[in-house]
């Protein structure tokens, strides 16, 4: 169920402060964050945000198509290693 329009989009305050500081200074260094639940705002466009996926920080370059989505959507937490191969098929 989507968030109520009455409440508005969510962003962690510590991340918002980091973004505003980076925009003011024009710094292109990636911003490290653990806040996967924060919504991407228009003032984040052009920044690189390193989002934690549980093991490491995944760099995410924010574009205009990402506005309104959550940061966690762009840092996958699970690695897919493929299904087990059939032993009979290998012998042939």
From Swiss-Prot:
GO biological process, one term: ribosomal small subunit assembly
Ribosomal protein in keyword set: yes
One example GO MF annotation: tRNA binding
PROSITE patterns, per database record: RIBOSOMAL_S19 (PS00323)
Subunit structure: Part of the 30S ribosomal subunit. Binds S13 and L5 and cross-links to the A site tRNA.
HAMAP family (alphabetical): Ribosomal_uS19 (MF_00531)
Similarity remark: Belongs to the universal ribosomal protein uS19 family.
Role description: In the E.coli 70S ribosome in the initiation state it has been modeled to contact the 23S rRNA of the 50S subunit forming part of bridge B1a; this bridge is broken in the model with bound EF-G. The 23S rRNA contact site in bridge B1a is modeled to differ in different ribosomal states, contacting alternately S13 or S19. In the 3.5 angstroms resolved ribosome structures the contacts between L5, S13 and S19 bridge B1b are different, confirming the dynamic nature of this interaction. Bridge B1a is not visible in the crystallized ribosomes due to 23S rRNA disorder. Protein S19 forms a complex with S13 that binds strongly to the 16S ribosomal RNA. Contacts the A site tRNA.
CC per GO annotation: cytoplasm; cytosol; cytosolic small ribosomal subunit
Alphabetized UniProt keyword annotations: Ribonucleoprotein, Ribosomal protein, RNA-binding, rRNA-binding, tRNA-binding
Name of this protein: Small ribosomal subunit protein uS19
PANTHER family: RIBOSOMAL PROTEIN S19P FAMILY MEMBER (PTHR11880), SMALL RIBOSOMAL SUBUNIT PROTEIN US19M (PTHR11880:SF8)
InterPro entries: Ribosomal_uS19 (IPR002222), Ribosomal_uS19_bac-type (IPR005732), Ribosomal_uS19_CS (IPR020934), Ribosomal_uS19_SF (IPR023575)
